[in-house]
């Protein structure tokens, strides 16, 4: 802006070279803003920071990417494999409590829930951060049985670790099993409702044949 003002003054001075009066400036000189006029911006500049709204979209996207940890494929596979091994260990320890399930119901449910949580974490790590990011951004809607299973899993862990209640832990484990069965039935090609009607129909026909046939 200062260069344009100077060039305009030189052009007017050349046009009125023979006049007694000097050319008056048409534009007022704008005072350049010095860095020290704004203490907050000066301090942020020394710290290497900028206001979020002062960044361009490209800079905001780059800043968002740098905030994410850089994990290689090998590290993700190692972490996922470790979670799956710990899940297998928890499932194995839970199987040891199966003969005394009535006496150690809370420990069995706790180990089973920890194994399920570790298995889910390992599967998420092996699946990759992009797929998990799509779920967190609600770009992929999870199914209702999956949400119910996650809620039952969290409730079981809270009842076992926080409340230390055997009854609530057993109820949470039962809710886990029901949600898991609903999720597995929902994965069938013909749908959960059709599969349930088919199973009930077969059970009804089997009961009718048992009544008709002689023993």
From Swiss-Prot:
Bilayer-crossing regions: 83-103, 108-128, 143-163, 167-187
Main location: membrane
InterPro entries from the UniProt entry: Vesicle_transpt_Got1/SFT2, Vesicle_transpt_SFT2
Protein's membrane topology: Multi-pass membrane protein
Localization annotation: Membrane
Stretches assigned to the Lumenal side: 104-107, 164-166
GO CC list: cytoplasm; endomembrane system; intracellular membrane-bounded organelle; membrane
GO BP annotation list: protein transport; vesicle-mediated transport
Family: Belongs to the SFT2 family.
Reported function: May be involved in fusion of retrograde transport vesicles derived from an endocytic compartment with the Golgi complex.
Designated name of the protein: Vesicle transport protein SFT2C
Organism, as annotated: Homo sapiens (Human)
